[in-house]
Amino acid sequence: MENLNRGGFDFDLCNRNNVLEKTGLRMKGFMKTGTTIVGVVYKGGVVLGADTRATEGPIVADKNCEKIHYIADNIYCCGAGTAADTESATALISSKLKLHKLSTGKQTRVITALTMLKQMLFKYQGHISAALILGGIDINGPSLHTIYPHGSTDQLPYVTMGSGSLAAMAVFEAKYKNDMTKEEAIALVAEAISSGIFNDLGSGSNVDVTVIEPSGVTVLRNYQTPNERKFRNNPYIFKQGTTPVLKQDIAPLSTKVVIEDIMMGQ
């Protein structure tokens, strides 16, 4: 009998999928998502930013969604990827950290949230479509982390993620400096998000900013609205005869009426 406990990766399912695809089965395609999320560390805290466009393929599903999620009183998280995955993942970790805080009686540390998120995403091997930027402040000071869908992480002074990340990173690389003030950090984050909005089709609408300081958190919802829609107060009214009639053809209308008697059975 064949030993089923052989080591290494088993390609049987891959071969099966190839056979099914050759017989005409349409395999599930890759889901393209779009977002621009950024974060930057300044002298006294952390500033997070995100756009507000949610898409369903080529369709704009929501023009003013929230992508900066609450984790703890001193920690927030930006999410890129599938909206349901980012919201569920952050809500789950937020509830676990609440229980952890009640158990320990101490302020939640950023590294605790980072560890919980990366362990959960690694366990699902990238099948949870959530690319996250975690920012917060604790006894170790302000910190900023990126968490990729497979569970890998980075800690940097400024980060970008999402389909508009390249445009946003170009702004950071050109204008970031050490020991920025809060006002400079907010302006830089807003410019980076705007760059993603105007250079990436998957990002759009408004700019959301969240400032995390030792004294508290400031949520600046719709901090900038670079794509504000304009509406006309009055409809277009054209005078009769404005458009010239080049050709006129009148055809007689003939109708044919057919009357049938239907005998009902007794």
From Swiss-Prot:
Pfam families: Pr_beta_C (PF12465), Proteasome (PF00227). The active site is at 35 (nucleophile). GO terms for cellular component: cytoplasm; cytosol; nucleus; proteasome core complex, beta-subunit complex. The keyword Nucleus applies. It is found in: Cytoplasm; Nucleus. One of its GO terms (molecular function) is threonine-type endopeptidase activity. It is an enzyme of class 3 (hydrolase). Residues 1-34 form a propeptide. Its EC number is 3.4.25.1. Gene3D superfamilies: Glutamine Phosphoribosylpyrophosphate, subunit 1, domain 1. It catalyses: Cleavage of peptide bonds with very broad specificity. GO terms for biological process: proteasomal protein catabolic process; proteasome-mediated ubiquitin-dependent protein catabolic process. Its main location: cytoplasm. Keywords: Cytoplasm, Hydrolase, Nucleus, Protease, Proteasome, Threonine protease. Belongs to the peptidase T1B family. PANTHER family: METALLOPROTEASE TLDD (PTHR32194), PROTEASOME SUBUNIT BETA TYPE-7 (PTHR32194:SF4). The 26S proteasome consists of a 20S proteasome core and two 19S regulatory subunits. The 20S proteasome core is composed of 28 subunits that are arranged in four stacked rings, resulting in a barrel-shaped structure. The two end rings are each formed by seven alpha subunits, and the two central rings are each formed by seven beta subunits. The catalytic chamber with the active sites is on the inside of the barrel. The proteasome is a multicatalytic proteinase complex which is characterized by its ability to cleave peptides with Arg, Phe, Tyr, Leu, and Glu adjacent to the leaving group at neutral or slightly basic pH. The proteasome has an ATP-dependent proteolytic activity. This is Proteasome subunit beta type-7. It comes from Dictyostelium discoideum (Social amoeba).
